[in-house]
Amino acid sequence: RDRVNMDCNSPEFLTETTEDSLKETEKYLAEHEGSKKVKTILAPRFAPTCSKPLIDGLGKLAAKYHCGVHTHLVESLWEAQEALNLFPGYSSDAEIYERAGLMDHGPSIFAHVIFPTEEDKRILKKHGSFSVHCPDATVNIIAGIMPLQHMEAEGLKIAMGTDIAGGHGIGIYRQVARAVQLSKLKEFYEPQESKTITITQAFYHATKESGSVFGKVGSFEKGYAFNALVIDNMEDPWTKMTAEEKLERFCYIGDDRNIKARYIDGELLEQEF
């Protein structure tokens, strides 16, 4: 759970003073400190909407309450340049968060990461940060396509998200399919630099890699929480499909009507969704 911070370059009705933003954030952190069900995280909207005093203040709160950070990173070329304009003396977008101490006390989660520089990638890898691919959102805002294959090959952690503000649905399974589709487009336009990812690659990033943000979730391995969906794949009795083909079918054409049961930490959820 997070509380978004922004004290500049934002609509007036969303802009806080630096002092109020830090005060309300600390109040929220203190309220949930020690909770077994709620994990807190800091959420500066992104560097262009946060002053240096705000970013530095959030870094101090991260140290005090031992929490991580969730924000956007190099979502667009404009964002990357604007961040450096507002933070002179910094060499990359990621360095803004690193120097503030926001990447030292918990998971650091960065949405989009479409135009990472070598310095951005070095910092992300150093801190074991998660770059979150949000396929639908990047299309909707005409941002670009994450270089997932390259980042994966360089050992960066890649999770997957829906970006409920920039996206248009909360089903992560559809993002799995969309990630494959976008990788095909990237290969088409950059055949010498990019290659298509497989459905199993995308599924791994959406499940085990994403789940590792929270601990041992996202896998059916021993010792992991049993979080699962029971899916009616509507398989034709005369059609033999592999497990991978069944997964692919659901990700591309399935929806919530195919989900017959949901388990969280081994418990069957009884309520309807």
PLM ranges: what are they?
Residues 92, 99-105, 149-237:
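His/Asp/Glu-enriched, well-ordered alpha-helical/loop segment
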Residues 21-24, 38, 51-58, 93, ...:
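General structural feature for long, well-ordered alpha-helical segments within catalytic domains
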Residues 225-273:
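C-terminal cap of metal-dependent C-N hydrolases
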Residues 59-68, 102-106, 123-132, 153-158:
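Glycine-enriched alpha-helix->loop->beta-strand junction motifs that scaffold or abut catalytic
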Residues 42, 72, 110, 124, ...:
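Divalent metal-coordination and catalytic microenvironments
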Residues 75-107, 112-126, 139-150, 168-174:
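Catalytic core of soluble alpha/beta enzymes
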Residues 45-46, 133-141, 161-169:
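Glycine-rich phosphate/pyrophosphate-binding beta-alpha loops
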Residues 1-111:
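Metal-coordinating catalytic core of metallo-dependent amide/deamination hydrolases
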